[in-house]
Amino acid sequence: LRVSRRDNSLKEESEHVKAKSFLAVSRRDEAFVILKQLAEDMSTPYGAESAYMLILDSYDKGDFEDVEKKVYAFSDSGSRQTYWLAKSFIILGDSFAERSELSQAKATFESVRDGYTPSGEDDDVLDNVRVRLAKLEEMITEQNNR
């Protein structure tokens, strides 16, 4: 059983590297086939990162409803991959801001800020949230002054 788990982990890592390599050389269609397969198991680091990358792709395409759907599915999956889940919620907050739903964006960012525990000193989640909250406050102030 230990060998099969290790084999699965190595295969998953290999597929993840392949997907990122495809992205690096603009072979997006091939990359996203692999990422979708990996994201079926969001409990693993590679599956969680793949889910995040699919969410980011939806955001980049301006498909904010799909962003919401995917982030909530990730959250409902029960994954313990909190870094990628938090990064996904940041994208969700960005999608609310893009739609001028500033109070919803603020609530989303504050939820991440208040509920997330960094996993190490290289963890950039809370820094990203702080920057977004500051920018959001500027946007809200500007909107209120109109």
PLM regions: where:
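Acidic, polar-rich low-complexity tracts and alpha-helical solenoid repeat scaffolds
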Residues: 1-146
